[in-house]
Amino acid sequence: MVSWKGIYFILFLFAGSFFGSIFMLGPILPLMFINLSWYRWISSRLVATWLTLPVALLETMFGVRVVITGDAFVPGERSVIIMNHRTRVDWMFLWNCLMRYSYLRVEKICLKSSLKSVPGFGWAMQVAAFIFIHRKWKDDKSHFEDMIDYFCAIHEPLQLLIFPEGTDLTENNKARSNDFAEKNGLQKYEYVLHPRTTGFTFVVDRLREGKNLDAVHDITVAYPYNIPQTEKHLLLGDFPKEIHFHVQRYPADSLPTSKEDLQLWCHRRWEEKEERLRSFYQGEKNFHFTGQSTVPPCKSELRVLVVKLLSIVYWALFCSAMCLLIYLYSPVRWYFIISIVFFVLQERIFGGLEIIELACYRFLHKHPHLNSKKNE
């Protein structure tokens, strides 16, 4: 049964992303055609203000407890984040970790392309220059090249989240993963899926070539009690009681240099995840970490609490104010309608705002294709 908590959570997030896209991100879009550096600097910070909202709601309103062990992030460092894909919404729960240990404004996510069409959420993700993929390497490789080369060219300090497993852990997906393991003489997994390493190795190599990689962060996520597998579970009010993250930081210069060794390195991390998660779920449901973190959290819990409270207050007032302005003033209503039409049409015609941003960079810097010099 749908719960009021779930409805409140989804509607609040939708309203924030919808009105935020139109009234906060919409006015800065022309800056894309004038100064891309300023556009990216401003848009990243505006989007990050919304990313604090689900963190605030989950922890402050619904009592979700977050436990983080292991390493943190060097402030401002550029990294690739690899994580097991336990549920379809792990990418959102990760914000609870990054809000404490890193900066939300530098995160980029590889997501399935259908999400960019979702009103509000998808529009903001396009402005944030998330990387949308079709999960077919022959279709995704060129887009990966363009986006990563663009980030390297503008010296964007990104932290790129990749799910090497490619999909979330369900019984059907686990059966397919184990069939693959049996055919290839590999270990069968219970708590993770076998990773697909092609995209991971490509991204790491490309970022290293562009001198835009400081580390790889290997994050293991676990849910000791209830596991909200899909967005539907959130709508039903099935929020996780606890989310545990274990972070391991690997400096870029410690990674293997060859593609084959990097693939093997990734597979070893997943073998470790399987054992770590087995100990977690069959034991005390904690990640046992006896060593010391090499990097401490960059924010205190008091600072995080203040940000969460301010986020809820700001977005509640902002959404209410925008509704009032739309009701009272016809110019605002016209702007509202025109903006919606623009966001819908630009995606259908051009493929998304991140594609337009790439085209602007090519035009302003006279680069017909960002990857033309590196293509095989």
UniProtKB/Swiss-Prot annotation:
It comes from the Eukaryota. It is an enzyme of class 2 (transferase). A motif (HXXXXD motif) lies at residues 85-90. Glycans are attached at residue 35. The modification N6-acetyllysine is found at residue 183. GO terms for biological process: cardiolipin acyl-chain remodeling; CDP-diacylglycerol biosynthetic process. Keywords: Acetylation, Acyltransferase, Developmental protein, Endoplasmic reticulum, Glycoprotein, Lipid biosynthesis, Lipid metabolism, Membrane, Phospholipid biosynthesis, Phospholipid metabolism, Transferase, Transmembrane, Transmembrane helix. GO terms for molecular function: 1-acylglycerol-3-phosphate O-acyltransferase activity; acyltransferase activity. Widely expressed with highest expression in heart, liver and 12.5 dpc aorta-gonad-mesonephros and lower levels in the 16 dpc fetal liver and adult bone marrow. In bone marrow, highest levels are found in B-cells compared with whole bone marrow, T-cells, erythrocytes, and granulocytes. This is Lysocardiolipin acyltransferase 1. The lineage of its organism: Eukaryota, Metazoa, Chordata, Craniata, Vertebrata. The gene is Lclat1.
